[in-house]
Amino acid sequence: MIYTPINAFALRRYKHILAVTKAFKYMLMLRGFKEERIDVIYNGIDFSQELQTYDMYTFFKNINVPHDLNKKYVGIAARLFAVKGVNVFLDMAKIIADKREDIDFIILGNGEMWQQCQDFIKGNKLENRVYMAGQVTDPVMMNSYYKYIDVNTLTSYSESFPYALLEGARCKCATVATAVGGIPEMIIDGESGCLVQSGDSKALAECVEMLCDKDDIRIRYGVNFYERAKENFSSQAMANTHKKIYEKIIKENVK
């Protein structure tokens, strides 16, 4: 109740506003901000450097997850808070685990829902199917995570333009995410990933199973996401957009 009025008051005193997504720009316009005052600059990450990773054996050993070459691995890297929809990920895992044994699940992250997640796993006898690896701070481990899982997921109820998806894209990891915030601007459904409605664990399970079963689609989505992100959401693309906007602002002020 305090945050919104204070920010609205501050934003109205600026001549130009930079929004991280078109969705956020539209939200500001609905609140009365003029469209010409708002420019969109997407988050970007570095695509120019070769990523360091551990070998597969070391990665799985470090997160205490048994590795089986005959299985697919589906992951989520998120803070364990309600807004991240980790409960939806767990519901999806149960749906799949109840009918097949060739897909396991990995959760990276800590948070207030840790015990709730543990209780769900134990209560549904998923201890050997869903693995909670905790918080990972080593960037090489995170690169390895996106390299060695088969499907990356994001189940949030609210997001802006999440780096977790861009990091997965950089490793050509196929992705299933909720269609919230700026995510539909990042992922083209059916081309560079799969989008589902927030809270829909059944749709999430269907997409995950499809990608695990169809290697050609999974690989194609990962490559397409990589190419799209490299072109539009790299740190260089972000810098170029900043430059163009600043040049436009300077030109306007010179008049």
Segment roles from a protein language model:
Residues 51-67:
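A short helix/loop element that forms part of the nucleotide-sugar donor recognition site in Leloir-type
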Residues 157:
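Aromatic "clamp/platform" in nucleotide-sugar-dependent glycosyltransferases that forms part
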Residues 72, 76-95, 112-118, 202:
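A conserved mid-protein helix/loop that constitutes part of the nucleotide-sugar donor-binding site
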Residues 118-136:
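Nucleotide-activated donor-binding/catalytic signature segment of Leloir-type glycosyltransferases, i.e.
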Residues 135-136, 144-149:
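Short alpha-helical donor nucleotide-sugar binding micro-motif in glycosyltransferases
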Residues 189-190, 194-201, 210-215:
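Conserved acidic donor-binding segment of nucleotide-sugar-dependent glycosyltransferases
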Residues 174-177:
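Short hydrophobic beta-strand element within catalytic cores of glycosyltransferases
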Residues 23, 44:
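Carbohydrate-associated surface elements
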